[in-house]
Amino acid sequence: MAEAQIKKNIFTISSSPHVRCDESVSKIMWSVCLALTPAAVFGVFNFGIHALEVIITGIIAAVVTEYFVEKVRNKPITITDGSAFLTGLLLSMCLPPDIPPYMVAIGSFIAIAIAKHSMGGLGQNIFNPAHIGRAALMVSWPVAMTTWSKLSASGVDAVTTATPLGILKLQGYSKLLETFGGQGALYKAMFLGTRNGSIGETSTILLVLGGLYLIYKKYINWQIPVVMIGTVGILTWAFGGTTGIFTGDPVFHMMAGGLVIGAFFMATDMVTIPMTIKGQIIFALGAGALTSLIRLKGGYPEGVCYSILLMNAVTPLIDKFTQPVKFGTRR
């Protein structure tokens, strides 16, 4: 413990500019967990005890994996800094409520051991760990990852039904409106969260409030969620309709699927996004465009996870072309 504390307090000599603040990795991670808590609690209310089991399993598996990997690597144990807890929480919030616990545990293991520590650990991973875990589960168990149940709050449980994006993809916009009883009722369900979907992605209002808290604390920049969500809105409005250009429903698409949780809590991951504001805007534009492309033209109803991972892959390239020019030199 003493050795870990000494390493934590070692100063690194480097050129200016220097960041001077009392923020720490631990404080930021636990603040993000706090911002996600209302949406997670609402997900448990919506989907019942199964959702709680998924969340607890995801968190415990992530923390335990972190502990043993750091033990094997002979690294300081950092399970109290909140990073593994956050990865497990984010992953579980992006999963169906009835997914078997062993799949959740495998997803957390992949997120921590492979996506995070195989790259060197916290601060060195190229891809968002939670999304790597989710993508691995989607490839390995596609049926379990696309099987949904009605909300427990509705009084009926364990009845297979589709998500709003699934209805739109398979049956069209008219059937979507018919299912929810009109456009107004659809928007209300999407905004409040009384709809089907992954555990933590249903309530737009709670996720936005959590995101605004992080913006207020200056832990994330507002440009990424605004540009990403706005890009999806514009492109789905222009090309998402069936009767011509600019006949799509942008309001629905901006609240649907995992866009809000992805834009506020995953696309803003400070480790896997570009360093400059210009680069972050390019990142958000690309993620929004890819999400729209997958939703409108792909075989899968949702594209947030894959769009963010693809943009993670080109982040070094974006950084290369958006880094500030040194004084007295040319690009």
From Swiss-Prot:
UniProt topology in membrane: Multi-pass membrane protein
Enzyme class per UniProt: translocase
The keyword Heme belongs to this UniProt entry's keyword annotation: no
Cofactor: FMN
Coiled-coil segments: none
Entry EC no(s): 7.1.1.-
A Pfam family the protein falls into: NQR2_RnfD_RnfE
Key words of the record: Cell membrane, Electron transport, Flavoprotein, FMN, Membrane, NAD, Phosphoprotein, Translocase, Transmembrane, Transmembrane helix, Transport
Subcellular location: Cell membrane
Residue numbers bearing the FMN phosphoryl threonine modification: 163
Induction: Up-regulated when grown on H(2)-CO(2).
Residues spanning the membrane: 23-43, 44-64, 84-106, 196-216, 226-246, 251-271, 273-293
InterPro entries: NqrB/RnfD, RnfD_bac
One Gene Ontology biological process: electron transport chain
CC terms in the record's Gene Ontology section: plasma membrane
Quaternary organization: The complex is composed of six subunits: RnfA, RnfB, RnfC, RnfD, RnfE and RnfG.
Family: Belongs to the NqrB/RnfD family.
Function per UniProt: Part of a membrane-bound complex that couples electron transfer with translocation of ions across the membrane. Couples electron transfer from reduced ferredoxin to NAD(+) with translocation of H(+) out of the cell. Essential for energy conservation during autotrophic growth. Contributes to ATP synthesis during heterotrophic growth.
This protein's name: Proton-translocating ferredoxin:NAD(+) oxidoreductase complex subunit D
